[in-house]
Design a protein with these regions (language model features):
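Short strand-connecting beta-turns/loops that link adjacent beta-strands
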Residues: 152, 188-189
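Short, conserved beta-strand element in jelly-roll/cupin
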Residues: 123-125, 136-152
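Fe(II)/2-oxoglutarate oxygenase catalytic core
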Residues: 1-120, 124-134, 191, 205-254
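A short beta-strand-loop-beta hairpin characteristic of the jelly-roll/cupin
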Residues: 148-169
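A short hydrophobic beta-strand segment most commonly corresponding to one strand
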Residues: 142-147, 174, 189-204
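Short beta-strand His + acidic residue motifs that chelate non-heme Fe in jelly-roll/DSBH
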Residues: 130-133, 175, 181-187
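Conserved metal-binding segment of the jelly-roll/cupin
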Residues: 165-180
């Protein structure tokens, strides 16, 4: 069977499943969720400056950070340059140990969030545009906490469906990424958010089914490959740091 036909059948099946799932969602089929309904969002907002401090330390070596498609290769359909950098703490439940060690306060905060599966710093360069796309599965909610927002905030925006939002430092937005969404940073400053995927709550029995499906996805080839790519980057980074450290020590002895 041709791959395109398999993809079409798979996509249609997912759409059918999602239409059933949303009937069991206490939040309905919305574009944006009300963050006030999730107490953990306030905890993040109240501690955003501590998160920002750890981010600033990470950004001191910005050029060494991996591009999104270097970690998650399927992202090449929406980005193929070096204008969207990432710093992963968690990816679909897989912990990036050395990165988490560099950001202990942020890690502790995200680990306290019920259903947290993915957490990373999403770093958009000035002028970066992410074309319209949709997420693969309705079983998670996408959350962004504004950490570095350009002064011309009106020119840095996200569209979900037919609604537009702007990020604010220290404030979060949460949306259903299975609705078509698009991002523009039409400014001369970078935009950074703490990017989270959270297991979406559903009434029984769909909640248990959803958690099972997410566990299966976490073992899929594309997630496994992304985990391998992340581990390779961490190893290269550690080796580079060790080499630089040794060079500095040697220079000090001269």
């Amino acid at each position: 069977m041709p791959k395109s036909l398999v993809d079409t059948i798979g996509f249609q099946l997912i759409q059918l499943i999602e239409r059933v799932m949303v009937r069991y969602s206490p939040h309905g089929d919305v574009l944006f969720f009300d963050t006030d309904e999730f107490p953990w969002t306030k905890t993040l907002e109240n501690n955003w400056e501590e998160i920002r401090n750890e981010l600033d330390a990470v950004l001191e070596n910005r050029s060494a950070l991996p591009n999104f498609q270097d970690i998650s290769e399927d992202q090449t359909s929406i980005t193929d340059d070096d204008q969207w950098k990432t710093f992963f703490l968690y990816g679909f439940g897989h912990k990036a140990e050395s990165n988490c060690a560099r950001c202990p306060k942020t890690t502790k905060l995200v680990e306290q969030i019920p259903g947290m599966k993915t957490a990373f710093f999403s770093i958009l360069a000035p002028g970066k545009h992410i074309p319209a796309h949709r997420g693969p599965y309705k079983g998670v909610m996408r959350y962004h906490l504004g950490l570095k927002v350009p002064q011309q905030a009106e020119n840095c925006r996200i569209r979900v469906g037919d609604e537009y939002r702007h990020w604010k430092e220290g404030k979060g937005i949460m949306f259903d990424d299975t609705h078509q969404h698009e991002v523009w940073n039409d400014t001369d400053e970078e935009r950074v958010v703490l990017f989270l995927d959270i297991v979406r709550p559903f009434d029984p029995p769909v909640g248990a089914i959803n958690r099972g499906l997410i566990k299966l996805i976490s073992m899929s080839p594309f997630v496994t490959k992304a985990k391998e790519n992340q581990e390779k980057w961490e190893k290269r980074h550690q080796q580079a740091q060790a080499t630089n450290g040794a060079a500095k020590v040697a220079a000090g002895k001269v």
